[in-house]
């Protein structure tokens, strides 16, 4: 394979991994432990 193809596949995989982890953190079971700064400062 060419170097550009391998680099493109690596960058695509890295981007998909970061996106998947972000969605899991935002909406998965971990999200129950996240704090909401807007609810802490209601007036």
UniProtKB/Swiss-Prot annotation:
It is found in: Plastid, Chloroplast thylakoid membrane. One of its GO terms (cellular component) is chloroplast thylakoid membrane. GO terms for biological process: photosynthesis. It is a single-pass membrane protein. The chain crosses the membrane at residues 4-24. InterPro entries: PSII_PsbN. HAMAP family: PSII_PsbN. This is Protein PsbN. It comes from Emiliania huxleyi.
């Amino acid at each position: 394979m060419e170097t550009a193809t391998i680099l493109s596949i690596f960058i695509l995989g890295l981007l998909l991994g970061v996106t998947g982890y972000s969605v899991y953190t935002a909406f998965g079971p971990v999200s129950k432990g996240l704090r909401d700064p807007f609810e802490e400062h209601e007036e």
